[in-house]
């Protein structure tokens, strides 16, 4: 991982969009600071596409799509995307894949199994807002659990046939062949006519993240950036970002904003 200051200057002028995780990338200790929100606003005002790509639930994403200075949002680790149509005064929601008919019953049963088997974890406080996935809290509203406990949660989800990803606060599991990257690719193609397979296209986007569930995005985008706390995960990252900020969490995102806008 190179320091963000090594980002080539030509990236700034060619850039058309910024994709970003939310928890511990935009937020700091669970709060969205004024500076981080203002950074989003500045990027959007500069004419860049701004799209959060998050593990947070549908209920939150509806609010984000409507009220934040963004061009859309990918939620629940790729289960759907949302985009607000101001003229029509509605939020367009596109779900990815066909969920199993008994999904909710399976999610409920697995949640009970995990909560019994892994002491100290809890159902995420935002689970009631979710449509497609199961979120187990290992760090947000509970005393942080050791790595072995997090791994045990992942194993149980995978044994149940789920895909499982670790964020900075939750372990998320879902039934379906999608993730943050696959849904981002589809959203950009269908909503903005952007093919990330076109020559040079992915170099026109920056992704900012902080944790293992961002690894597909880190590995795909050549100009991926980790805020400094990404280093806390060490070798648990399947792919690491190309660049890393000096600041942690929201301060790191502000740093990315400053660097990108300085060159435009």
Task: State where each predicted segment sits.
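Short, well-ordered beta-strand core segments
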Residues: 18, 43, 50, 73, ...
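Short, structured coil segments at secondary-structure junctions
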Residues: 68-69, 77, 160, 220-221, ...
């Amino acid at each position: 991982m190179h320091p963000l200051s090594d980002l080539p200057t030509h990236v700034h002028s060619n850039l058309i969009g910024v994709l970003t995780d939310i928890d511990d990338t935009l937020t700091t200790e669970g709060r969205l600071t004024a500076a981080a929100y203002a950074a989003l606003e500045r990027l959007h005002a500069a004419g860049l596409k701004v799209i959060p790509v998050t593990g947070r639930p549908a209920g939150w994403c509806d609010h984000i799509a409507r009220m934040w200075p963004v061009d859309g949002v990918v939620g629940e680790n790729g289960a759907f995307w949302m985009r607000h149509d101001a003229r029509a005064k509605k939020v367009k929601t596109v779900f990815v894949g066909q969920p199993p008919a008994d999904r909710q019953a399976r999610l409920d049963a697995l949640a009970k199994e995990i909560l019994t088997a892994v002491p100290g974890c809890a159902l995420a406080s935002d689970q009631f807002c979710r449509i497609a996935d199961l979120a187990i809290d290992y760090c947000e509203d509970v005393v942080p659990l050791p790595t072995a406990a997090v791994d045990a949660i992942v194993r149980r989800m995978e044994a149940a046939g789920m895909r499982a990803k670790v964020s900075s606060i939750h372990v998320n599991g879902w039934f379906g062949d999608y993730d943050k990257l696959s849904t981002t690719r589809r959203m950009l193609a269908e909503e903005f006519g952007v093919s990330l397979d076109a020559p040079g296209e992915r170099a026109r986007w920056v992704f900012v993240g902080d944790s293992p569930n961002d690894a597909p995005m880190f590995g795909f985008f050549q100009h991926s950036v980790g805020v400094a706390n990404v280093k806390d995960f060490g070798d648990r990252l399947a792919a690491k970002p190309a660049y890393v900020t000096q600041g942690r969490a929201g301060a790191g995102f502000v740093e990315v904003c400053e660097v990108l806008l300085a060159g435009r």
